């Protein structure tokens, strides 16, 4: 696939699976725009915007932000993009979001190219998330409010309950590719490249 062609990659996996790290690298190396609804929302919270004030209690509680807010953010981000070359990290999380995204991508003539699902055992995920918070604190950086064990466990449960149907949705469409998310970042990245050609 040449750089001038549409390419839409959707990263799936539980919180702490490494989606953000891998999406950043893939975006850089394949000239794709990374769209992370989590990053966009945290930026709004940090800036104290009206949207940030609305979603802060939701994020702090480890809950998922309502679809209407996320879909509006994505529509705005994709507006005018030509060609559409993007990686989604943290969106969609529900079948309703996936259907809305599919409709938007159809309007743009840019169907989903690949959906890698990063798979990591729950206890490894919790350890990664808590360690991410510890490392940020050691560096004197702000610690994400969701980088605690309690919130991380709640997020894992919410993920399982609300995201499994999405995994089934993409599997039924032949887009889903299972990727072992355990190993060094390079090992995981090389596995991702095998499914995102």
From Swiss-Prot:
GO CC, alphabetical: cytoplasm
Pfam families: ADK (PF00406)
Subcellular location, principal: cytoplasm
GO biological process, any: AMP salvage
Superkingdom of the source species: Bacteria
Residues annotated for AMP binding in this entry: 37, 42, 63-65, 90-93, 97, 144, 155
PROSITE patterns, alphabetized: ADENYLATE_KINASE
Residue ranges of coiled coil: none
Annotated region described as LID, given as residue ranges: 131-147
Keywords: ATP-binding, Cytoplasm, Kinase, Nucleotide biosynthesis, Nucleotide-binding, Transferase
Gene Ontology molecular function: adenylate kinase activity; ATP binding
Places the protein is found: Cytoplasm
The keyword Nucleotide-binding is annotated on this UniProt entry: yes
Region feature (NMP): 36-65
SUPFAM superfamilies on file: P-loop containing nucleoside triphosphate hydrolases
Enzyme class, UniProt record, top EC level: transferase
EC assignment: 2.7.4.3
Catalytic activity of the protein: AMP + ATP = 2 ADP
Pathway stated in the Swiss-Prot or TrEMBL entry: Purine metabolism; AMP biosynthesis via salvage pathway; AMP from ADP: step 1/1
Record: residues binding ATP: 16-21, 132, 183
Family the UniProt entry places it in: Belongs to the adenylate kinase family.
Quaternary structure, from the entry: Monomer.
Protein's job: Catalyzes the reversible transfer of the terminal phosphate group between ATP and AMP. Plays an important role in cellular energy homeostasis and in adenine nucleotide metabolism.
Written domain comment of the UniProt record: Consists of three domains, a large central CORE domain and two small peripheral domains, NMPbind and LID, which undergo movements during catalysis. The LID domain closes over the site of phosphoryl transfer upon ATP binding. Assembling and dissambling the active center during each catalytic cycle provides an effective means to prevent ATP hydrolysis.
Alphabetized PANTHER family for the sequence: NUCLEOTIDE KINASE
Protein name: Adenylate kinase
Organism: Deinococcus geothermalis (strain DSM 11300 / CIP 105573 / AG-3a)
């Amino acid at each position: 696939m040449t750089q001038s062609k549409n390419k839409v990659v959707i990263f799936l996996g539980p919180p702490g699976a490494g989606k953000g790290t891998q999406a950043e690298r893939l975006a850089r190396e394949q000239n794709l725009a990374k769209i992370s609804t989590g990053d966009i929302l945290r930026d709004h919270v940090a800036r104290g915007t009206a949207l940030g004030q609305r979603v802060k209690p939701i994020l702090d509680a480890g809950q998922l932000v309502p679809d209407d807010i996320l879909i509006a953010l994505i529509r705005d981000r994709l507006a005018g993009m030509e060609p559409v070359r993007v990686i989604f990290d943290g969106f969609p999380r529900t079948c309703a979001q996936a259907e809305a995204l599919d409709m938007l991508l159809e309007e743009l003539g840019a169907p989903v190219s690949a959906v890698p699902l990063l798979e990591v055992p729950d206890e490894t995920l919790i350890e990664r998330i808590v360690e991410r918070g510890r490392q940020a604190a050691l560096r004197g950086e702000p610690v994400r409010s969701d980088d605690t064990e309690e919130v991380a466990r709640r997020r894992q449960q919410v993920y399982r309950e609300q995201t499994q149907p999405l995994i089934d949705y993409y599997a039924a469409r032949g887009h889903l590719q299972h990727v072992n998310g355990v190993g060094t970042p390079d090992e995981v990245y090389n596995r991702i490249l095998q499914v995102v050609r």
